[in-house]
Regions:
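Positively charged, small/polar-rich N-terminal and surface patches that mediate targeting and assembly
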Residues: 2-109
């Protein structure tokens, strides 16, 4: 949890990790901007495959596409809106397997 120094008020934060097809970078940034989520860390090329459906993204001759990933530490109250935005984006290209995972943030400095 993040403690606001001035008021000692707890602010619950979550880490949201999102893996998505590289071609959706602009759309992901647009969704973050809409929700006023400014800070994130971005990995341009990551490999992987979904556990149920979707195509592998290995960057090879057989599976040439690659994913990107980002992680953002956001207030708990923005999590549901971000997950809904990810669901909507995933629905536009279900074979690409855009996924978001939410983790607790214990401490920040």
């Amino acid at each position: 949890m993040y403690l606001c120094a001035a008021k000692k008020k707890e602010k619950i934060m979550k880490a949201v990790f999102i893996s998505f097809y590289k071609a959706f970078y602009a759309e992901m940034i647009e969704e973050l901007d809409k929700l006023e989520i400014r800070g994130f860390t971005f990995w341009e090329e990551v490999q992987g495959r979904g556990n149920e459906t979707g195509e592998p993204h290995y960057g090879t001759h057989a599976w040439p596409t690659l994913n990107s990933a980002l992680i953002a530490m956001i207030p708990d109250e923005k999590v549901d809106a971000l997950l809904e935005a990810v669901r909507k984006l995933d629905a536009t290209a279900p074979q690409q397997g855009i996924r978001a995972f939410v983790l607790p943030v214990e401490k920040m400095s």
